[in-house]
């Protein structure tokens, strides 16, 4: 008679900066109570391929991005920053930066990523010590590619704009921007740019100044500092992981054949190592039950295969807060997460 195969199961708890998951797995699966397997950094080869994506983030990728942003925000120290212009930024945690093309895209996004954006990341790692970061590629409404970057390093606006404009001008994007303005009439100037906040006289003055002094450096960078406002990390995570803008259009150079497997997002090795603190649930049953019963700031959802507890570590009661900070701090040390000064 055929003997039915059976195996023993056990309940596992997985703790992340914004949620706790309780689920069942086969017994003897490894948890973070045991040393992790040795991690190898694999060099890219010609045989390496990423999955085809049709220029859309998968649901799995969106979830991963949300989780990585939560880790980035939680591990980032809160500090005051003095910028290059001597401006003091109070309570800085992470920065959110956007890099655009100042003129019409003339190359595939894959080429721009490999020749320009990758060079930007290399220079930022070398010159600023950036180690913990995540980036995402998107299309604008005009079809141009642009990049969002989140990192725990403060990057001065003028500093990164100078670097980015120098790099993208290898492909002529700054020169074409200046040529466009050099040949622009006042009618074109008004039609191409939104000057609703300026009077007609101010528009003419701005246009004449541009004609005399040149267009200057294009505004190809946007900077947003993220401080300790309530749930701001959740906002950034949601923005980073959102689906593509339905009004955006892909430029004429990008096709599924030449760009269908290019990266739409990526994170540093330090964030890639952040998965969650896993332990056996029987060791934490009383603690989790008390957390659910006594802390009113949390939200609990019961799913078919797991239970999820969502929380904001800054809002939970002090007794639980100290425990979670200790667990996550020990995990940071356990995975050798790089510190940011």
Residue ranges of each PLM-predicted region?
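Right-hand nucleic-acid polymerase module
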Residues: 1-143, 154-341
